[in-house]
Amino acid sequence: MQTGRVQQTLAGCIERTGKSLHSGKVSTVKLWPGFAGEGRYFDFRSNVIPASIDYATESPLCTTLRKDGYRISTVEHLLSALEAMEVDNCRIEIENSDPEDDDHVEVPIFDGSASEWVKAIEQVGLKVATDECGQSYERMAAHVNEPVHIRKNGSVAAAFPSPEVRITYGIGFPQAPAIGYQCLSSAPFDSSYYTKQIASSRTFCLYEEVEKMRNLGLIKGGGLENGIVCSASKGWLNPPLRFHDEPCRHKVLDLIGDLSLFARFGSQGIPVAHIVVYKGGHALHADLARMLSASI
């Protein structure tokens, strides 16, 4: 259905360089204005990988896009910011600082939130996106008309009919009392709410799982400067939190990024629905996006 506005893109170029979370290597991202109808896509070594659920593959602790042997990891925070800030069309050029990594690159983590991307988008601004002939396109949005849900290993993700975008998210970490059980519900969900309540929430982990994750080759670039760490016995190791329920809010940030992969041809990625998730993760988010995609 029509949203009542035309598709948008960036008013200028954005360039940011930083360390990645899992590989620990440095990469540079350049965001370029895109043509109307192109949507969001990555350009890695002249290989185009659309930011689409069709190219999402399961990977530990992040969302990865794969096409023709090339992989781009930890795309969720960047895509979350682009979706929430209504950047419908964008060319995302990304490159490694290490020339030996010719088939894999990871988006920088910065402080573990989407704040760096949101600030950059606000600084450069937005403009109406047009195609190569100068024509603008209507921004469309999918509406959920019948409930859909998926369950997996005690987790659930669902989408219910709603006149507006709403998100309800719950998490449970009984092994870490400082986190415990948290729930966040937003109505309605829009760019203003995202900027003030979601974008600055940082990724988090349990201290007792750090060694295990590093033995698996993960979070090599992780530290107290790019995430919040909670100990089961000692609580938060690098307070203060930005919100009392910052872990739950970060899960919403991830969800927006993962559901943005539902977008097609510059349309809205988040479907107009009440999205409800409990104990979710990137794989479950992607499964919900695939289920929604298969229903249209």
What are these regions (language model features)?
Residues M1-I296:
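Short acidic-hydrophobic catalytic motif
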